[in-house]
Amino acid sequence: MEANIVKEEIKKILIESLNLQISPDEIKGEDLLNEFGINSVDAISIFISIENTFDIFIEDEDLSAALISSLDSITNFIMDKNNR
């Protein structure tokens, strides 16, 4: 799967998980935590959606604010998981 496709899917996950009333194009994705005020409950919902959408398992030690800090960090994580 290509990185740009992964990013678009992540944007859809963010919109759904955070109940955002915006289009995917409006997500800048450089600082997701501050851009959307993601809390721990939101993060768990996002992680679960990522696991289901991309058919990956996120290990407990991978769960962190750094992982969902930006679109690039999430994309890189998913691409790494899919390449294993």
Regions found by a protein language model. Give the residues of each.
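Conserved catalytic core of two-component sensor histidine kinases
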Residues: 44
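Phosphopantetheine-dependent thiolation modules in NRPS/PKS and related acyl-activating systems
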Residues: 2-38, 48, 52-84
